[in-house]
Amino acid sequence: MVLTTSKQPRKQRKALYNAPLHARNKLMSAMLSKDLKEKYNKNALPVKTGDTVKILRGTFKGIEGEVSKVDYKSYKIYVEGAVNRKQDGNESLYPIHPSNVMIVKMDDSDDRRFKFSNK
């Protein structure tokens, strides 16, 4: 999905900032594990709440957990297990970009999500 044809970084950033919700959903895609790739014949699918993902990059590399929240405004997901400890002892979920995770197990409660496999 092309948001803009410009090469200018400022216009690329502006296109991401002003992107409609259906385009943001597509941009929130993460790669699938090997067995899911074979099963669905797709390399990547949008991340949804309830999916189990493995973090591949960053401080929390190697952690596997369930997606508890997907933030379409900031293009981030929140994974259980990737937490920051605050000064007062509380824990807060750490935001992670979906390009840095791999979907290991998908939440199959939504039938519309798998309608592409009928084609």
UniProtKB/Swiss-Prot annotation:
Alphabetical list of Pfam families matching this protein: KOW, Ribosomal_L26
GO CC field: large ribosomal subunit
Upper taxonomic lineage: Archaea, Methanobacteriati, Methanobacteriota, Methanomada group, Methanococci
GO molecular function terms noted in the UniProt entry: rRNA binding; structural constituent of ribosome
Family as reported in the entry's similarity comment: Belongs to the universal ribosomal protein uL24 family.
Function, as annotated: One of two assembly initiator proteins, it binds directly to the 5'-end of the 23S rRNA, where it nucleates assembly of the 50S subunit.
Subunit structure: Part of the 50S ribosomal subunit.
PROSITE patterns xrefs: RIBOSOMAL_L24
InterPro entries: KOW (IPR005824), Rib_uL2_dom2 (IPR014722), Ribosomal_uL24_CS (IPR005825), Ribosomal_uL24_euk/arc (IPR005756), Ribosomal_uL24_KOW (IPR041988), Translation_prot_SH3-like_sf (IPR008991)
Xref: PANTHER family: 60S RIBOSOMAL PROTEIN L26 FAMILY MEMBER
Organism: Methanococcus aeolicus (strain ATCC BAA-1280 / DSM 17508 / OCM 812 / Nankai-3)
Protein's UniProt name: Large ribosomal subunit protein uL24
Domain of life from the UniProt record: Archaea
SUPFAM superfamilies recorded: Translation proteins SH3-like domain
Keywords per UniProt: Ribonucleoprotein, Ribosomal protein, RNA-binding, rRNA-binding
GO biological process, one term: translation
